[in-house]
């Protein structure tokens, strides 16, 4: 009987994620409703054709998490503080990054809250049909309740509290999407073919759709906020240079879990939507196609996953602006400060834009994920310079393998940014 609790798969997953540490925030930043939306649109419209983009994004995310984590442990400095201190024009670069990342993440938050509130309300309508027709007020009230609870937790919380809450959300999310994968398993050959790089053609003739979707996948997976925030979360965890192996394992497991969870979502979308030519127009379209296969159970599973993905992203995104500003100022994050509480409060108000305006959260989410790509080359270039400085890194200076990984990440980010710009210009 003593071993029974340890045989519980949910508890095992919880303990595994708790052991990951700062990487849990990387999963929170990366897999939100924006990621879910991008993966479902990719899987439903193009099958597994864009799996290569997800794989490369996760591979390069691992490289960049390793680089930023190593820099933090060796120097004791945070990212933007290091840029300001050691790079020529470092202050200008840092300010540009703060503006770009905060704007992109706040836009993501707008879509995330809209999708999460829609998902909850539309699921409630399934069981209480009398609420149909009250969507605007239902979604708005739901959004207000969600963001109020989150802000209250931020007001009273600490790193350890946030980490444990994120672990719970990510546990539910991971299990939900993994179970959904087995409900609609795609063909193995389609998965293998998806590892061959290609940009899909859109049958209806819309220009730039394929490039825009690739940029959205990369934008949500290789989020600049993930790498910039890593040094401060490592600081919050209390790790030192003695934890170098822990940091490396943390980065590796975070990247692996991001690939498995995101890949499962894409595969489910392919199995449920692709062959029937169903297009995702609203939040519940994501779960409707699973109902004939597994009934209401499928809706419940996927709903829990989508909601957990959204809520796991709200915490880190609310924190990103005060985190980056504190990073730039002195490299320290005080979660009890007036500045932290004020800026997170402003983010909460901004997040209500989609529910108040009654906008389509799916379309808003895809566009905002693309915005996250454009500051990424700056973020990669900065760490490439710093981690190769002998006077800063000593024996932990980047070796050939890490340097190749960072350079390839930079080339990949520039390529995706270029294609994202072209796609947006073609749609104007």
Where do the model's predicted regions map?
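Juxtamembrane transmembrane-helix boundary signature
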Residues: 26, 53-86, 97-110, 269
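Hydrophobic alpha-helical segments and their helix-loop junctions in multi-pass secondary transporters
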Residues: 171-202, 214-215, 220-231, 382-391, ...
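Transmembrane alpha-helical segments of multi-pass small-molecule transport proteins
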Residues: 125-155, 171-178, 334-353, 376-385
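Membrane-interface loop-to-helix entry segments
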Residues: 145, 153-184, 371-372, 376, ...
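Hydrophobic transmembrane alpha-helices that form the core helical bundles
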Residues: 92-131, 310-329, 360-367, 414
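Transmembrane-helix boundary/entry motifs in multi-pass membrane transporters
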Residues: 9-15, 47, 74-103, 126, ...
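Flexible loop linkers connecting adjacent transmembrane helices
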Residues: 2-5, 39-41, 66-90, 118-129, ...
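Extracellular/periplasmic helix-exit of transmembrane alpha-helices
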Residues: 62-74, 234-235, 256-285
């Amino acid at each position: 009987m003593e071993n029974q609790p340890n045989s519980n798969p949910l508890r095992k997953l919880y303990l595994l994620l708790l052991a990951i540490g700062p990487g849990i925030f990387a999963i929170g930043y990366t897999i939100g409703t924006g990621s879910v939306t991008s993966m479902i649109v990719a899987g439903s419209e193009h099958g597994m054709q864009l799996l290569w983009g997800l794989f490369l994004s996760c591979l390069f995310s691992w490289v960049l998490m390793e680089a930023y984590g190593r820099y933090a442990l060796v120097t004791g400095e945070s990212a933007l503080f290091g840029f300001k201190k050691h790079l020529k024009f470092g202050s200008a670069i840092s300010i540009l990054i703060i503006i770009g990342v905060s704007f992109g993440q706040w836009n993501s938050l707008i879509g995330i809250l809209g999708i999460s509130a829609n998902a909850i309300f539309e699921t409630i309508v399934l069981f209480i049909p009398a609420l149909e027709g009250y969507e605007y007020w239902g979604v708005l009230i739901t959004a207000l309740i969600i963001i109020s609870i989150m802000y209250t937790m931020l007001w009273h919380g600490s790193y350890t509290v946030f980490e444990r809450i994120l672990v719970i959300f990510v546990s539910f999310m991971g299990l939900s999407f993994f179970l959904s994968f087995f409900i609609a398993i795609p063909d193995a050959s389609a998965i293998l073919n998806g590892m061959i790089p290609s940009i899909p053609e859109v049958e209806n003739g819309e220009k730039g759709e394929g490039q825009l979707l690739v940029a959205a996948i990369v934008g949500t997976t290789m989020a600049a906020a993930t790498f910039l925030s890593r040094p401060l979360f490592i600081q919050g965890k209390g790790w030192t240079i003695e934890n170098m192996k822990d940091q490396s394992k943390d980065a590796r497991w975070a990247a692996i879990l991001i690939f498995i969870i995101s890949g499962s979502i894409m595969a489910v979308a392919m199995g449920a939507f692709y062959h029937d030519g169903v297009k995702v127009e609203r939040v519940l379209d994501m779960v409707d196609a699973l109902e004939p296969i597994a009934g209401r159970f499928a809706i419940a599973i996927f709903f829990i996953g989508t909601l957990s993905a959204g809520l796991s992203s709200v915490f880190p995104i609310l924190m990103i602006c005060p985190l980056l500003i504190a990073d730039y100022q002195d490299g320290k994050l005080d979660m009890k400060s007036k500045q932290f509480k004020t800026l997170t409060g402003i983010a909460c108000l901004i997040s209500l834009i989609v529910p108040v305006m009654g906008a389509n959260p799916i379309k808003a989410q895809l566009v905002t994920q693309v915005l996250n790509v454009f500051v990424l080359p700056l973020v990669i270039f900065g760490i490439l310079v710093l981690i190769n400085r002998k006077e800063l890194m000593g024996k932990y200076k980047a070796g050939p393998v890490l340097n190749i990984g960072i350079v390839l990440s930079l080339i990949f980010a520039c390529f995706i940014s270029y294609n994202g710009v072209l796609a947006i210009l073609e749609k104007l």
